[in-house]
């Protein structure tokens, strides 16, 4: 008897972007950034992306990336650019 494996769809539904409740990271990104514009949407989206996937992909590296994008957003807001 052979083991049947479901091939991961790494383009449309990569496992490191799937959350335990059926949502995918893209669902959260779209909901949160829907009312944001330009660089603010990009920065917030990247913060969320790296936080959502850190435990399944690159661990501390992803948390540092999230921190980098968050720091950039904070800097822009402090300068009145957002």
Language-model regions: role of each:
Residues 1-82:
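Intrinsically disordered, low-complexity regulatory regions
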């Amino acid at each position: 008897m052979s083991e049947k494996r479901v091939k991961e769809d790494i383009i449309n539904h990569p496992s490191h972007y799937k959350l335990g409740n059926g949502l995918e990271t893209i669902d959260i990104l779209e909901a949160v950034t829907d009312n944001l514009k330009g660089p603010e949407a990009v920065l917030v989206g990247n913060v969320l992306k790296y936080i959502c996937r850190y435990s399944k992909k690159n661990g501390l590296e992803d948390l540092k990336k999230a921190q980098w994008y968050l720091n950039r957003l904070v800097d822009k807001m402090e300068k009145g650019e957002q």
